[in-house]
Amino acid sequence: MSAQVNLQSASPNIDSPPAEDVSYSLYFGLGQCLTLVDHPEVFKVSAAGKAFGSLLTRRFGRQYADARFLDIGTGSGVHSLLLRRLGMKSVTATDISPQAIDVARINEVANLGAGDVRFIHSDLFDGLDPTNDAFDVILFNPPGWQTPSAAFLQALQRTESAQGLSIEAMFYGDRTLKRFFDEVPLFLKPGAKLIIGLNSLVGIPAVMHALCQKHEADYHIDWCLLERHEFPLMLYTQQWRQLQGLIHEEIVDWTRQGAAYCRFNEQGDIIWSYEILELTFSRRSIDGNGQ
């Protein structure tokens, strides 16, 4: 059941979406249901986001109540609010979009009735200080595929339907992940965990290889695959749907080159893999010989 949320009374910085799209509800198990604003400038929670939330519900119980959580790229705030609902006392959330932060705060009041989450407008870790902001668990469910080819970008420039389109909203996920992985160890307490959801179209092997190259001299990095889901490729805007042919060709090229993974169902739809990993970073000790 949808709830009616008055956006303008909750925040003067948010323009109200059409009345028929005011809100939507998601259920994650253990009685945890959240009602979220459906605002055109903030990503609606995807099937992958729902799977990520369901994992959090199963993974983090009362023993984590006093742990410090950081949710990077919070979007609607769904995972931060879910953690608070599950009893986590200290939750910080960042997003590069000021509209997302405004909507997340509205969602917080609608679902929790109080401002308990520390929301910060920030590009990844930019708004945080590693000397004061160290966390037991960091969450990241990054959007985006890998960097598009030069041929794709040239074709896109010749396509009228691509005018005004934000390419960064869908592509360059590998660059975002590189920036994220470059800094994340600085914000993890000893023994802390990183929970991250990766899209197989981002090029997971290359991303993990770059992570090891960056940090293996200073950290022992361990990871495990917590769960994997398969979802059909969804193009959420009319502009992206008009570019479906170009996008499919690009994804097929990535897959043929071994730079990404997808498969096709009987209808010819692209099916991608969503993979949730848990990572730990243990600082290497240095003996007298520097080994």
Which residues fall in each region the model found?
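SAM-dependent Rossmann-like transferase core, predominantly class I methyltransferases
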Residues: 5-86, 246, 260-279, 284-290
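Conserved SAM/SAH cofactor-binding pocket of Class I
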Residues: 53-131, 137-148
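Short amphipathic alpha-helical segments
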Residues: 105-106, 150-153, 207-209
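Phosphate/oxyanion-binding active-site loops and adjacent basic polyanion-contact surfaces
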Residues: 44-49, 96-100, 173-177
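Mobile active-site "lid"/loop adjacent to the S-adenosyl-L-methionine
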Residues: 139-176
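C-terminal catalytic and target-recognition region of SAM-dependent MTase-like enzymes
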Residues: 205, 210-291
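Conserved Class I SAM-dependent methyltransferase catalytic core
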Residues: 173-229
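Generic structural signal for residues in well-ordered beta-strands
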Residues: 34-36, 117-119, 221-223
